[in-house]
Amino acid sequence: MIIPWQDIAPDTLENLISEFVLREGTDYGEMECSHQDKIEQVKLLLKNGDAMVVFSELHETVDIQTKARFNPNMTNHDFE
């Protein structure tokens, strides 16, 4: 189930994004970005609709998925 990021309390959203950034370990190119810069980049992805907050009812977990990686038909998640 997709959760509108605007409906999430600001502190909770910040923590969710921070966890996502730490877990992803994404390569940001030759220039190293600060943790806060990476958080701002993910916020921009959410605002632009290029990422979404997803709740799995099956696993009772919340995650951020990029639009490119999101697959509502995945069999190991209960996305709607």
From Swiss-Prot:
Gene3D superfamilies: YehU-like (1.10.10.610). InterPro entries: UPF0270 (IPR010648), YehU-like_sf (IPR036685). SUPFAM superfamilies: YehU-like. Disulfide bonds: none annotated. Belongs to the UPF0270 family. This is UPF0270 protein VSAL_I0295. The lineage of its organism: Bacteria, Pseudomonadati, Pseudomonadota, Gammaproteobacteria, Vibrionales.
